[in-house]
């Protein structure tokens, strides 16, 4: 990335946040590498701007380009704020997950529609604090329109028996340790489908930033509830390596579809516009607003405080 331009002045509406198992996108032309500094610090990695079918796509490595950030250390606010600031409104996030259900086999993919938060407040999880308050709806944490696009791309996966499950509940645990066996059975009793350490607060922050957001989950193990084998890093790595081509095929197909839809209401997240802004403006009275907090909100939404 060292010889790429560090500025880019054209619209970038679509982003991929790559996690464990998807550290880069292949077959896309890199045209810039941005290193923004947000009011919440620097993002986890430079933001690569890639050209795909004539459409610009941003790629950010959630855990850093060397996987140096543990799940609780990921600068989620900086990641989402930096993407929003360059124009991104539509985010596809990739995550390796453990399966909590027999029918979701290692190497299967899941398009979750619900999430249960089992993080512990260690991770900063809102943009609206310190003198500005906002309460944003999160009943349906993922974007139904983006989920529909992902589901139509299942045909691009290869391999016997590999399935794309069209819904499910992802449990997000604190980590970085894996679950105890008792916890794993508890999550199953709650109706959890898969488990990871990354989807929150990322999805909550994307909602606050008025972005369409959908996670694609790739099962790498059966967590520790299953008698098959206890989860460990070696097992996760084995399945990720075996299925990395399918992960890249699926994400590539999704980007093909989204590139065709660039500038559409879905990609521009028109259906989320105003959700946060109304909540923030009506909650904190002008005399109670902290000037520094107002500047931070302005970074997300330029012109936010103008009447």
Swiss-Prot record:
Write out the pathway annotation from the protein's UniProt entry: Amino-acid biosynthesis; L-methionine biosynthesis via salvage pathway; S-methyl-5-thio-alpha-D-ribose 1-phosphate from S-methyl-5'-thioadenosine (phosphorylase route): step 1/1
InterPro entries of this UniProt entry?
Answer: MTAP, Nucleoside_phosphorylase_d, Nucleoside_phosphorylase_sf, Purine_phosphorylase-2_CS
**What is one Gene Ontology biological process annotated in the Swiss-Prot or TrEMBL record?**
purine ribonucleoside salvage
Cellular component (GO) terms are: cytosol; nucleus
Q: According to its UniProt record, which reaction does this protein catalyse?
A: S-methyl-5'-thioadenosine + phosphate = 5-(methylsulfanyl)-alpha-D-ribose 1-phosphate + adenine
The alphabetized UniProt keywords are:
Cytoplasm, Glycosyltransferase, Nucleus, Purine salvage, Transferase
The UniProt annotation places substrate binding at: 197, 221-223
| EC number in record | 2.4.2.28
Highest taxon, organism lineage: Eukaryota
In chain numbering, where does the site feature Important for substrate specificity fall? 179, 233
Give the SUPFAM superfamilies listed for this entry.
Purine and uridine phosphorylases (SSF53167)
State the top-level EC class.
Answer: transferase
What CDD domains does the annotation carry? MTAP_SsMTAPII_like_MTIP (cd09010)
In which compartments does the protein localize? Cytoplasm; Nucleus
Could you say which residues bind phosphate here? 20, 62-63, 95-96, 198
- GO molecular function annotations of the record: mRNA binding; S-methyl-5-thioadenosine phosphorylase activity
Oligomeric state and interaction partners are given as:
Homotrimer.
Family to which the UniProt record says this protein belongs: Belongs to the PNP/MTAP phosphorylase family. MTAP subfamily.
According to UniProt, the name of this protein is S-methyl-5'-thioadenosine phosphorylase
Q: Which organism is it from?
A: Fusarium vanettenii (strain ATCC MYA-4622 / CBS 123669 / FGSC 9596 / NRRL 45880 / 77-13-4) (Fusarium solani subsp. pisi)
């Amino acid at each position: 990335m060292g010889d790429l331009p560090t500025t880019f002045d054209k619209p970038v509406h679509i982003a991929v946040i790559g996690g464990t198992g998807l550290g880069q996108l292949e077959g896309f032309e890199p045209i810039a590498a941005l290193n923004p500094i947000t009011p919440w610090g620097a993002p986890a990695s430079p933001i690569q701007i890639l050209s795909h079918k004539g459409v610009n796509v941003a790629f950010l490595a959630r855990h850093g380009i060397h996987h140096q950030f543990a799940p609780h250390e990921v600068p989620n606010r900086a990641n989402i704020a930096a993407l929003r600031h360059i124009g991104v409104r539509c985010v596809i996030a990739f995550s390796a997950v453990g399966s909590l259900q027999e029918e979701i086999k290692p190497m299967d993919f899941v398009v979750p529609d619900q999430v249960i938060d089992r993080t512990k407040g260690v991770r900063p999880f809102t943009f609206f604090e310190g003198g500005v308050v906002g309460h944003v709806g999160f009943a349906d944490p993922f974007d139904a329109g983006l989920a529909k696009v992902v589901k139509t791309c299942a045909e691009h996966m290869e391999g016997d028996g590999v399935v794309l499950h069209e819904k499910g509940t992802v449990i997000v645990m604190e980590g970085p340790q894996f679950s105890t066996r008792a916890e794993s059975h508890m999550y199953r009793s709650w109706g959890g489908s898969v488990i990871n350490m990354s989807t929150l607060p990322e999805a909550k922050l994307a909602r606050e930033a008025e972005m369409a957001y959908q996670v694609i989950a790739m099962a790498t193990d059966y967590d520790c509830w299953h008698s098959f084998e206890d989860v460990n890093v070696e097992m996760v790595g084995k399945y990720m390596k075996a299925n990395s081509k399918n992960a890249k095929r699926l994400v590539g197909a999704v980007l093909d579809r989204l590139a065709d839809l660039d500038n559409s209401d879905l990609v521009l997240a028109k259906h989320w516009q105003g959700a946060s802004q109304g909540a923030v403006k009506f909650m904190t009275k002008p005399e109670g607003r902290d000037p520094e907090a107002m500047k931070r909100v302005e970074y997300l939404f330029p012109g936010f405080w103008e009447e």
